[in-house]
């Protein structure tokens, strides 16, 4: 299914929230969408790993890392785990690492920046709660659409047949 956030905004602007353009794409998949699953943690990724061990089919993990770019919340090992468990993508309000490996893993990843320092592996944090960054609030069960142009959020699934009929 083709995703184009620009065209989705043309069709559904009154139904979507547009995330501030603060993210870059780092994964092997450039466009992805799915139902939001949230996690909030600061410079730790143990809880992220627990969540990525779940079946992620049709889901996108939205990580509120407090905007910290001092430690990477996602690395190649976690990205492979996510891909193996069929996650559609990961949005990280924080840092990631091991870019040369991430670009070869079949998952969409958007993050603020890379840094070589790993996160602490403790599992402090909260999951399935509303998180706020990039000018929007992400609620569990919202729908997220991402590509190289940007990230948009909707409370209801968007009809992608509108794009793919062209």
Swiss-Prot record:
Protein keywords: Cytoplasm
GO terms of biological process kind: regulation of RNA metabolic process
Gene Ontology terms: cellular component: cytoplasm
Broad class of the protein's primary localization: cytoplasm
Gene3D superfamilies: Ribonuclease E inhibitor RraA/RraA-like
PANTHER family (UniProt xref): 4-HYDROXY-4-METHYL-2-OXOGLUTARATE ALDOLASE 3-RELATED, REGULATOR OF RIBONUCLEASE ACTIVITY A
Protein's name in the database: Regulator of ribonuclease activity A
Species annotation: Actinobacillus succinogenes (strain ATCC 55618 / DSM 22257 / CCUG 43843 / 130Z)
Underlying gene: rraA
């Amino acid at each position: 299914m083709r995703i184009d956030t620009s065209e989705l905004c043309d069709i559904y602007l009154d139904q979507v929230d547009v995330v501030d353009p603060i993210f870059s794409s780092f994964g092997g998949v450039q466009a992805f969408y799915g139902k939001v699953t949230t996690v909030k943690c600061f410079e730790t990724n143990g809880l992220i790993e627990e969540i990525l061990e779940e079946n992620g089919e049709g889901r996108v993990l939205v990580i509120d890392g407090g905007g910290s770019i001092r430690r990477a919340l996602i690395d190649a090992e976690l990205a492979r785990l996510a891909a193996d468990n069929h996650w559609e993508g990961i949005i990280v309000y924080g840092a990631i690492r091991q870019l040369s490996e991430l670009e070869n893993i079949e998952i969409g990843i958007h993050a603020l920046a890379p840094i070589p320092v790993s996160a602490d592996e403790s599992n402090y944090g909260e999951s399935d709660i509303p998180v706020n960054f990039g000018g929007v609030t992400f609620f569990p069960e919202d729908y997220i659409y991402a590509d190289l142009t940007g990230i948009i959020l909707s409370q209801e699934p968007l009809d992608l047949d509108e794009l793919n009929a062209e």
